[in-house]
């Protein structure tokens, strides 16, 4: 596959709104009208339980991993980075949702880094798990994990292009969590629960 073809594939795969599709298929509802309105795994877990939510999380991760991995191993490292960035852009503004608001990029960005810079991905995953375990805030875990991306990029001495991707990804994830940050400041952010119930805003 060509450089341009893989970047296009990245955007198309990133545009697959798995949370929206799976909830439509298995529950007959619009996830955008439930809980926080997000199409990502966190909102799906809160509203419909772990099985459906974790499935969404895995698929959202894979749609970032696949184009990034293919680009790195079959074209060039830069292709993998740009294909991964395209997947994140697709997740944010999905073609299949007519470019309306998508997800917050956390799982998809994780998949991208597993495809292009696995040690960064592993480090960020550890940060997410530890932070979530201590706080039970998915938003705080995601923000801390995002902040750690460029740190791990420097620690493991990755290329300039990977470092740039880490900064861009961190900024994007933090920016997309700005409403969560506001709720954290006012003490109205909700801690995560795996109980099957309708989601409170996050």
Task: Indicate residue ranges for each PLM-predicted region.
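Loop-to-transmembrane alpha-helix initiation sites
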Residues: 122, 138-146, 157-169
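Cytosolic, membrane-interface loops and tails of multi-pass inner-membrane proteins
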Residues: 20-53, 101-102, 182-202
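Short, non-helical or kinked segments that cap or interrupt transmembrane helices
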Residues: 29-38, 97-110, 137-145
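C-terminal ends of transmembrane helices
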Residues: 19-24, 88-100, 128-135, 178-182
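Interfacial segments of multi-pass membrane proteins
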Residues: 45-48, 67, 71-76, 90, ...
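Nucleotide and nucleotide-moiety/phosphate-recognizing core
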Residues: 2, 6, 52-97, 119, ...
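N-terminal signal-anchor transmembrane alpha helix
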Residues: 1-27
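Alpha-helical transmembrane segments of multi-pass membrane proteins
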Residues: 10-15, 86-91, 128, 132, ...
């Amino acid at each position: 596959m060509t450089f341009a073809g893989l970047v296009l594939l990245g955007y198309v795969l990133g545009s697959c709104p798995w949370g929206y599709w799976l909830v439509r298929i298995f529950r007959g509802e619009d996830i955008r009208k439930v809980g926080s309105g997000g199409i990502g795994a966190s909102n799906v877990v809160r509203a419909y339980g772990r099985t459906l939510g974790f499935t969404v999380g895995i698929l959202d991760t894979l749609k970032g991993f696949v184009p990034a991995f293919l680009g790195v191993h079959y074209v060039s490292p830069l292709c993998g980075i740009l294909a991964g960035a395209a997947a994140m852009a697709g997740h944010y503004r999905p073609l299949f949702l007519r470019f309306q608001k998508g997800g917050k990029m956390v799982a998809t960005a994780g998949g991208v880094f597993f495809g292009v810079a696995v040690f960064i991905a592993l480090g960020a995953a550890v940060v997410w798990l530890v932070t979530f375990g201590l706080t039970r805030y998915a938003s705080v875990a995601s923000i801390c994990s995002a902040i750690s991306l460029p740190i791990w990029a420097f620690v493991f001495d990755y290329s300039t292009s990977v470092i740039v991707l880490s900064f861009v990804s961190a900024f994007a994830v933090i920016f997309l969590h700005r409403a969560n940050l506001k709720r954290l400041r006012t003490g109205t952010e909700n801690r995560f629960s795996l109980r099957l119930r309708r989601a409170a805003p996050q």
